[in-house]
Design a protein with these regions (language model features):
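Short acidic/glycine- and proline-prone juxtamembrane loop motifs at membrane-interface regions
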Residues: 129, 135-143, 179
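Transmembrane-helix signature of polytopic, membrane-embedded enzymes
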Residues: 105-126, 144-145, 160-168
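Short helix- or helix-capping micro-motifs
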Residues: 19-22, 120-128, 132, 152, ...
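Membrane-proximal lumenal/periplasmic loop motifs of glycosylation machinery
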Residues: 29-42, 53-74, 80-88
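Start-transfer (signal-anchor) and selected internal transmembrane alpha helices
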Residues: 1-25, 110, 199, 208-212
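Short hydrophobic alpha-helices at membrane interfaces in multi-pass membrane enzymes
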Residues: 153-174, 206-211
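Loop-to-helix entry region of an early transmembrane alpha helix in multi-pass inner-membrane enzymes
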Residues: 70, 74, 84-103, 133
Length: 212
């Protein structure tokens, strides 16, 4: 109940709605569908369409090899399967995801500084970089969403340790790594930090194995 009282629910809805309105407005007035296949975006679109049609993950021009990770193309393939090969549908889904990210970032701030949810959530909602990237077929929006959830559950675990919170934190970090490799080395860092925490807390080996 700590995380879901009425005030937090109202703030969550407010931040989400403001973020969604801003991102929807940007997408409606400033995004040309033809722009969504330019440069790196075209490569992701091609991979997503290929997965949706064949179920195989490879670049059509290079045989069964790819310089991309499978997370984001699979995300695109799911959208193409559900809504057809409509790149604006991708933008719509990403505007929703990015609006949720603003809420998650606000919750992260709240776990560190009480009463900061609204301020930090609104800063995220108004963040021009986030707004622009939500309207591009690139990994940024999906990765930030997944990585933010990892941080949120990591903070929740540190405050009130529970195996489910640890499992969710590690799972979202692993999924985020399938979207962008930048978080790959954090997996080992997280394990190291957990060990340090257990040592500082003087937790016995039996309890460490139980938590892990």
């Amino acid at each position: 109940m700590e995380y879901f009282d009425n005030r937090i629910i109202r703030t969550t809805i407010f931040v989400f709605v403001v973020a969604l309105i801003l991102r929807t407005g940007y997408s409606y007035f400033f995004i040309d569908p033809e722009y969504l296949i330019l440069e790196d975006q075209g490569g992701y679109v091609q991979l997503g369409q290929s997965i949706a049609k064949t179920g195989d993950f490879f670049q059509l021009t290079d045989g069964k090899h790819t310089g991309r990770l499978p997370g984001y193309p699979t995300f695109l393939a799911i959208i193409y399967t559900l809504f057809g090969e409509n790149n604006m549908a991708v933008v719509v889904v990403q505007t929703i995801i990015d609006s949720l990210t603003c809420v998650v970032i606000g919750l992260i701030a709240k776990s560190v500084i009480p009463r900061s949810f609204l301020v930090v959530g609104m800063i995220s909602a108004l963040n021009l970089n986030m707004i622009i990237h939500s309207g591009m077929i690139l990994t940024d929006t999906l990765f930030l969403f997944l990585f933010s959830i990892f941080i949120l559950f990591a903070f929740y675990y540190l405050r009130h340790p529970a195996r489910l919170k640890l499992f969710l934190a590690i799972s979202f970090l692993a999924i985020a790594t399938l979207v962008r490799p930048v978080s790959y080395f954090l997996i080992m860092l997280v394990l190291l930090l957990l060990i340090v925490r257990f040592i500082l807390k003087r937790i016995q080996l039996k309890e460490i194995m139980y938590n892990i």
